[in-house]
Amino acid sequence: MKAIVKPFIATALMGVFFLNSDVQAQEPSEKEVKQAFAPKGTHRAPFSKSKEVALTSVNLQFKFTTRQEQEKRKVGNVITWGFLEGVEDALLQEIADEYYKRLAAKLQAGGFSLSESYKDHKSYLKLVENNNDLPREINKKNWGISKIFTANKAPYIEYPTGMLGAHSALGNDLKMPVGQLFITIDFIEITQNISKGLSSYTLMDGSSRTDQFETDMRPVIRVEGVTAGSIGRALKGDGTYAKFTGGNWSYCNAIFRNDFSITSDIPYANNVEAAKGMPESMKKFKSDVVGDLVSIFSKGAVKNGRANLEATYTILANPQAYKNAVLDALDKYNDYLMAYIRENN
């Protein structure tokens, strides 16, 4: 068996990123929009006759630990972890607030004015009450760790997946699109490969195989879609989506497809460290979210004999560059969202 953890080559990749960062983003085509969003997300087109839009809750989910696993039957599996360091909560709130301003400007450029008439409506107050216990710190052992920040420190609201409820009544009563956004931002792109080799047997060495296990990565900001493991109610708080309800019980749910993502070309990493297994620095790292990260690795991750290759990458971010890269990816997301609204309303 051959296990390979590919090191991150900072100089080469940063050069590529800088070359790409000057390329201007283009409006997504109709085909690209269809590839990005799940089908049948609109009913009675809430945006079609309205010149006003309300945003009840704009939420950004920032991942700072990412886990990815690939398995090949009868060969083995690869588990790769990425850790993000150097980004503070104050910066994440700052990004969320700035994103709200950019989204509002994008909607206004599309012919919509922003309304805050929802704030005193009984259905909005009901939504706030129903969502007051939503966790802002997420720990999923097969996915990673994240924190959720709401723009302008507004209440964190999630619309139900069903059609009926306070969210529907709110849009219907106000007769305008009233929505909430949830956007997941990852910091790493992981690649994994498993190649089945040949089996052999010798008297001296016994049985052996030439299977090969590889993992690699690049530090890149990604707005990512719903993960493949989420269905039904689990779709809430996972992936990227914008849900609006409007007059005549209409709705517009722009939900990114499984595994779809938008990336930024702006580099943000100051340094990357690669290791097989869990690095010593991580054993001492205390997370504000879940305490000792060692406990997470004990849930089916590192040094328990379950993976043929177990690797970690620790990324130290430049805070300002991280902010620029995230906002760049979010600007691209806004282009997709507005294109979806135009084509489906």
Predicted regions and their residues:
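Bacterial Sec-dependent N-terminal signal peptides
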Residues: 1-30
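Surface-exposed intrinsically disordered loops and tails
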Residues: 141-145
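A structural "domain/chain start" motif
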Residues: 25-138, 153-261, 265-345
